[in-house]
Amino acid sequence: MAEMIHLPRSTFERLKMYRKVLEATKKPYISSDEIARFLEINPDLVRKDFSYLNCQGKPRVGYDVEELRKELDDLFGVNNTTNMIIVGANDLARALLSLDFSKAGVKVVAVFDTERENVGKFIGEFAVRELDVLERVIRRFDAEIAALCVSKDRAQATAEFLIEKGIKAVWNFTGVHLDLPEGVIVVEEDLTQSLLTIKHLLKK
């Protein structure tokens, strides 16, 4: 199977959508035409994307759903759990804790906050910790991801502190563009931008 780093970004994004389709189907086999119809894309594009995987379709039968799912799970690292911390003890953190990240191979191991008055309070099953113990927790749980939910004015400084203490990837919910060292993974989650997409589609 091709390493994820060699995949074109557009292919990577589509493979995530294919995985979602496979999770929903109850059939043992599925064709590229069926996937294409569901996602309203060209079947040739589906077949081209699947050429990156060690999973061959059968003529007039399609792809083995279970085999294809395993290939995609391996590609996305779903079978290897990665630990994540949440920084920012607020309603957004509560919303994140209500989600099942195990489907992505991710486990939340701790919640932190920059405000000392929130330390010791509970969000779900987690007692909020102070940032003074961040490095110790990162080492103990081998946490690699931080979901950043702090206020905009604290976003850059907090992100820099997280990287300094050993975090490798930041899932950024602050709405602020982060300027971090090369090699640090940053994924921006801007809900406003998603709404702009919806508004654009409503115009059509």
UniProtKB/Swiss-Prot annotation:
Under the heading SMART domains, the entry gives: CoA_binding
Q: Which SUPFAM superfamilies match?
A: NAD(P)-binding Rossmann-fold domains, Winged helix' DNA-binding domain
Q: Which GO terms describe its molecular function?
A: DNA binding; DNA-binding transcription factor activity
Q: Which named protein is this?
A: Redox-sensing transcriptional repressor Rex 2
**DNA-binding region(s), residue ranges:** 17-53
- Describe the subunit structure: Homodimer.
Its BP terms in the Gene Ontology are:
negative regulation of DNA-templated transcription; response to redox state
Spell out the InterPro entries in the cross-references: CoA-bd, NAD(P)-bd_dom_sf, Rex_DNA-bd_C_dom, Tscrpt_rep_Rex, WH-like_DNA-bd_sf, WH_DNA-bd_sf
Specify the species.
Thermotoga maritima (strain ATCC 43589 / DSM 3109 / JCM 10099 / NBRC 100826 / MSB8)
Locations listed in the record? Cytoplasm
Tell me which PANTHER family the record gives: REDOX-SENSING TRANSCRIPTIONAL REPRESSOR REX, REDOX-SENSING TRANSCRIPTIONAL REPRESSOR REX 1
- Function per UniProt: Modulates transcription in response to changes in cellular NADH/NAD(+) redox state.
What cellular-component terms does GO give this entry?
cytoplasm
Q: Which Pfam families match?
A: CoA_binding, Put_DNA-bind_N
Q: Which UniProt keywords apply?
A: Cytoplasm, DNA-binding, Repressor, Transcription, Transcription regulation
Task: Give the family, as the similarity comment puts it.
Answer: Belongs to the transcriptional regulatory Rex family.
Disulfide-bond pairs as recorded: none
